[in-house]
Amino acid sequence: MEVIQYPNSPFKLHQPFPPAGDQPTAIAGLLEGLSDGLAYQTLLGVTGSGKTYTMANVIAQSGRPAIIMAHNKTLAAQLYAEMREFFPENAVEYFVSYYDYYQPEAYVPSRDLFIEKDSAINEHIEQMRLSATKNLMTRNDVIIVATVSAIYGIGDPTEYQQMVLSVKEGDTIEQRDIIATLVSMQYERGDLDFKRGSFRVRGDVIDVYPAESSENALRISLFDDEIDRLDMFDPLSGSLIQRVGRYTVFPSSHYVTPRDTVLRACESIKEELRERIEFFAREQRPVEQQRIEQRTRFDLEMLYEMGFCKGIENYSRHFSGKKEGEPPPTLMDYLPDNAIMFIDESHVTVTQIGGMYKGDASRKQNLVDYGFRLPSARDNRPLKFHEFEKVMPQTIFVSATPAKYEEEHAGQVVEQVVRPTGLVDPQIIIRPVATQVDDLMSEINDRIEKGERVLVTTLTKRMAEQLTDYYSELGIKVRYLHSDIDTVERVEIIRDLRLGLFDVLVGINLLREGLDIPEVSLVAILDADKEGFLRSHRSLIQTIGRAARNVNGVAILYADKITDSMKAAIDETERRREKQIKFNEEQGIVPQQIKKQVKDIIDGVYHEEDGSKGRLKGKNKVKVGEIHNEEDAIKEIAKLEKAMQQAARDLQFEEAAVLRDRIRDIKENLLFGAE
């Protein structure tokens, strides 16, 4: 492993091997585009060509902070794990939604049903979010891996920075002033329960457990009114780690606000409330008039007394001082001016970013219309797409199949078609639809004999289920991947396929970007000639690419005619194959099969979340004694949580509460080391 630091770059790249294939030219091309000031570029990188490694090299050589956007938590976790391996000495951060479970506030007029906001916050993810913003403000060697959570409103960066507590050995400051500052930063005093986001006082010593810290706490030792020494210590064992000359404690929430800002916001909220009460009075809607007055006055009382209230984000416009309709502050406002943005799998992510605002707006409108929220609540929202475009730094779109937006905006397209391993795109074979099930059966048997795996994609859920049942009856080990399966279970199914616990995976939308299964040597696309979203040329290229990580990779398209989408996908795949084969011949490269260790792609990130990804009916409860280890506990929690969410959706709140308590028992007794 070679460690490389380029001139004027704060990044130390741990390079397992030098760039190969198309990587060197792609890296040089992207760096040239950045230095030429191109606002948008596209990295057209085929499956398995090492796009993440190329991104890491561009970041290391440019020396600029970076944000990498992904379209789901699984892909973000995969990128985060890889970037941490490339940059273990730099600040690689993870910024995704910190909700394990989130039921937004909503009102259903037809049933006169108001649904209170309910959520379960994952403390580990919250700590990582706070760590991300802290490092953006204090370091220049930062890489943030984020989902669309980055375009949702968080606290204003200017006010967030005003609320820090900076301490230095030798400073003169009274103990009560330190305590008052910590309380205003929403730290809790916890002399008995010392946890993240709390502090405790013992004589002249104040221990602070910073909200963004995953393992170390700060000890402030005072002598009279002077800071005598500062030490970092292990909050679990109490052992000292190192003495520090100075330290900056950041707020325990992104929504912390100075007292004068809170008071100013309260006056502004009162004014809006008065206008809203008058509006409902004119409209002769006494129920809504009473509702908005009662709810808002309660929130105002909490703000005056505590400085925050439940649902404080709905008043964010009053706190930030922005005008109606102006974009809220987001993570994008924390980025330094010289940052670079990578949008991974941009053909999906760009569309996803564009769709976030409208879904949020329609729900908020009902709350406003029926007096549950003031109209300013509509400004607590994700960015609209044109607002996102305005705050985008220099951007590199990364995709094997760039969409129309990238094609229209990219100043240049850099191709990364040749893989470092010498693997070429799979050979495409077209066969008739009439015999597709039986023909595929014989192909599957061939692959099973060789110890290889098969992906089968169908058009409908019914077809997928019938095919799975049919092959299963014939003795083939087959599983069906469908939309009801949550993120963690999906990762487990893919891991089981790689381990050979079953040989065939059937699904409807198996083009899932980032699906990395080197053992798959055959991708079968049934009814490939039916035009539509699942059989568009981009979907076909993505699906065919799932076999590109295997030296014997083949894609069989079952079709009676060649559609425009099929032709485009076949032509593009053949173009890439020709280029790859030619390069291999010129360089004397023999394609090498990828041998990739089977492990959880989300090591270090998702195990914290495993305990909150799915739920099981109360009647299926398992006694604590039947759970023997942490792995059993995690699986049991996953089942219980799936059932809890379903019970909540079915309005079976008593059952949901029982399941919630059961989950808490397992976590306390097993996951956190009961005696």
From Swiss-Prot:
Keywords: ATP-binding, Cytoplasm, DNA damage, DNA excision, DNA repair, Excision nuclease, Nucleotide-binding, SOS response. A motif (Beta-hairpin) lies at residues 98-121. Residues 634-669 form the UVR domain. InterPro entries: Helicase/UvrB_N (IPR006935), Helicase_ATP-bd (IPR014001), Helicase_C-like (IPR001650), P-loop_NTPase (IPR027417), UVR_dom (IPR001943), UVR_dom_sf (IPR036876), UvrB (IPR004807), UvrB_inter (IPR041471). SUPFAM superfamilies: C-terminal UvrC-binding domain of UvrB, P-loop containing nucleoside triphosphate hydrolases. GO terms for molecular function: ATP binding; ATP hydrolysis activity; DNA binding; excinuclease ABC activity. Residues 436-602 form the Helicase C-terminal domain. Residues 32-417 form the Helicase ATP-binding domain. One of its GO terms (biological process) is SOS response. Pfam families: Helicase_C, ResIII, UVR, UvrB, UvrB_inter. It is found in: Cytoplasm. It comes from the Bacteria. GO terms for cellular component: cytoplasm; excinuclease repair complex. ATP binds at G45, V46, T47, G48, S49, G50, K51, T52. PROSITE patterns: HELICASE_ATP_BIND_1 (PS51192), HELICASE_CTER (PS51194), UVR (PS50151). Forms a heterotetramer with UvrA during the search for lesions. Interacts with UvrC in an incision complex. The beta-hairpin motif is involved in DNA binding. Belongs to the UvrB family. The UvrABC repair system catalyzes the recognition and processing of DNA lesions. A damage recognition complex composed of 2 UvrA and 2 UvrB subunits scans DNA for abnormalities. Upon binding of the UvrA(2)B(2) complex to a putative damaged site, the DNA wraps around one UvrB monomer. DNA wrap is dependent on ATP binding by UvrB and probably causes local melting of the DNA helix, facilitating insertion of UvrB beta-hairpin between the DNA strands. Then UvrB probes one DNA strand for the presence of a lesion. This is UvrABC system protein B. It comes from Neisseria meningitidis serogroup B (strain ATCC BAA-335 / MC58). The lineage of its organism: Bacteria, Pseudomonadati, Pseudomonadota, Betaproteobacteria, Neisseriales. The gene is uvrB.
